[in-house]
Amino acid sequence: MRGFPQRKASLVPLKPNGKGNEHIAWLTDLIKELKPNDKVLLICSTKERVESINESLRIEINVKMGMFHEDMTLIQRDRSAAYFAEDDGAQLLLCSEIGSEGRNFQFAHRLVLLDLPLDPALLEQRIGRLDRIGQTETIQIFVPFLLKSGEEMIARWYHEGLDAFETCQQSGHRYVREFGGELTKLMKKADASGANPKKKYDTLLEKTRAFH
């Protein structure tokens, strides 16, 4: 729709490195490529993961960043949001799921989804923190995932099945009701075996694309 920002999704497959820090290593490289005024909003599901990412990044790289999660007071969250909004403030804001509720960050143009909810409405809510009137640039959405894992299953399902990263989904709950159980089983199977159930997964993608 004219007047609304465009979205561009970048799915980033990560090969297991044996250290268990694949997402942090990729995120560190992304930060190194930022220009001084670039802003990145990162959203993940829990405050524990936010705190873990914060600790890991402080070891790996010197970058101005803030946190935003439910155990912070309202004043603390306001200060973090304000610091992120300043031109010379934080380049990276690490948010738990609460960061996708009620706050708008349309001055940022990069969104990192370090994990994905099995809920298209919640995914849209996350993206909506940047996809607002007043957004002046194409929104770059980064979705890193471990190869041959449940992360890959859900990331590709959203992208190849629903096109949910680049287009607004108004009835995503119907897809979850129809395919959520099957997707969850395939995700668990991939995590347990370290291999993708390709035939069954390709069939799921085809059914998802054909579903109305």
Regions found by a protein language model. Give the residues of each.
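Conserved helicase ATPase core of P-loop NTP-dependent helicases/translocases
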Residues: V63-E97
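Conserved interdomain hinge at the start of the Helicase C-terminal
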Residues: L14-S45
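C-terminal accessory region of SF2 helicases/translocases
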Residues: E137-H212
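Interdomain linker/hinge connecting the two RecA-like lobes of the SF2 helicase core
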Residues: M1-G20
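Conserved SF2 helicase motif VI
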Residues: D119-I141
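Conserved helicase motor "Helicase C" RecA-like lobe of SF1/SF2 P-loop NTPases
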Residues: C44-H69
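SF2 helicase motor core recognition
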Residues: E51-N54, L93-H109, I127-Q135
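A short beta-strand element within the Helicase C-terminal
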Residues: R103-D115, Q140-V143
